[in-house]
Design a protein with these regions (language model features):
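Extracellular interdomain linker/stem segments of modular secreted and single-pass surface proteins
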Residues: 17-21, 128
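C-terminal edge beta-strand
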Residues: 11-17
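Secreted/periplasmic proteins that engage bacterial cell-wall peptidoglycan
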Residues: 25-131, 135-140
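Surface-exposed loop/edge segments in extracytoplasmic proteins
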Residues: 9, 136, 146-148
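Short coil/turn motifs at secondary-structure junctions
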Residues: 142-144
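Intrinsically disordered, low-complexity, charged/polar segments
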Residues: 146-167
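Short, exposed coil/turn segments at beta-strand boundaries within extracellular/luminal domains
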Residues: 4-10
Length: 167
């Protein structure tokens, strides 16, 4: 959507003009590489990811497939990113949970770096949680230059979100 493209344009403009730090949120910037000090429980290999009900390179496509890497399932029709936190039959918590889907409401900030689409929201996958409460997410979306990216959320940022526990 136009608003999503504008949001990404604003993010990348700020990113490029500030040397890679938007300076707005305290979390880390968006990066295609695993941030320093973090590890993944399983490597990401998108070559086997399917796109039957979620469009390729959308946040929903990536999160659904990444969860399957861990044997975790979400419904084939969970809706847009903001809809995941509203789906019946799933436990939803505001406590960051490893290997859960983190659902961002429409317009909600994503780690102080950019805002989720005002209509569709966003969804990402929780890769790790540090003892200081910071959270590593992996995510995809058509506005990113790579198939997936990583981003670190501070404890304060992470506490404002909804974590959907898969089955």
């Amino acid at each position: 959507s136009l608003s999503k493209r504008q949001g990404f344009a604003e993010y990348w403009y700020t990113f490029m003009t500030t040397g890679g730090d938007s300076g707005t949120g305290g979390g880390s910037g968006i990066t295609p590489d695993i941030p320093s000090g973090w590890t993944l429980d399983k490597p990401i290999n998108t070559s086997g990811y399917i796109a039957s009900s979620y469009e390729y390179k959308q946040c929903t496509w990536f999160t659904w497939n990444r969860a399957k890497d861990f044997g975790i399932t979400f419904g084939m029709y969970m809706g847009n990113g903001a809809d995941w936190q509203k789906q019946a039959g799933y436990t939803v918590t505001t406590t960051p949970t490893i290997h859960s889907a983190v659902s961002f409401s429409g317009g909600q900030t994503v780690g102080g770096q950019w805002n989720a689409d005002p209509v569709y929201g966003h969804v990402a996958f929780v890769e790790g949680i540090h003892s200081d409460g910071s959270v590593l997410i992996s995510q995809s979306g058509t506005g990113f230059s790579t198939v997936y990216t990583f981003q670190v959320l501070t404890k304060a940022q992470a506490s404002q979100l909804h974590y959907v526990i898969g089955k």
